[in-house]
Amino acid sequence: MHESYIRIGKILKTQGNRGAVRVLPLTDYPERFKNMSRVQVSLKGFRTFFTVGEVYHHKNFIIIKFKEIESMAAAEKLKGAFLEVGRDELVPLPEDRFYIFDIIGLKVYDTGGRNLGRVTDVLQTGANDVYVVDTGGKPLLIPALKQVVKSVNLTEGKMVVELPEGLEEL
């Protein structure tokens, strides 16, 4: 799936009385916020850019003061909005690593060329991700391990896997 804009955070509420907002990071790279000069804010189908002023971490959140927002009342109107970036602004990943939104929607084939279905979700388990494949019946859970996932071709929208023995019966 090739999204035009990728969500990297969600504004939860205001922070203080000067118009700052508390953001839940939706990215594995929350440090990116400190290096941003502007960010797109999307709320109820409308998008606009804001200039990033002060940024700091507070517990598991990011506090951002946009230069255009001067008051708590103005910041309150942004509650529930998403912070988004274009694909060209994504943090580059190492080779053989992929963004979840690129994996969802891929067609999955076994090494023999049999179509197993489509990736509909990615479970983040801590040890390794697990791809949820819609087979038309019971979902197939495929561990995202090099021994199992033989290739991913985003251009072709295709993933090739070598299923461990018995995995389809689980």
Curated annotation (Swiss-Prot):
One of its GO terms (molecular function) is ribosome binding. Residues 95-167 form the PRC barrel domain. InterPro entries: PRC_barrel-like_sf (IPR011033), PRC_RimM (IPR056792), RimM (IPR011961), RimM_N (IPR002676), RimM_N_sf (IPR036976), Transl_B-barrel_sf (IPR009000). The keyword Cytoplasm applies. Keywords: Chaperone, Cytoplasm, Ribosome biogenesis, rRNA processing. Binds ribosomal protein uS19. Belongs to the RimM family. This is Ribosome maturation factor RimM. It comes from Pelotomaculum thermopropionicum (strain DSM 13744 / JCM 10971 / SI).
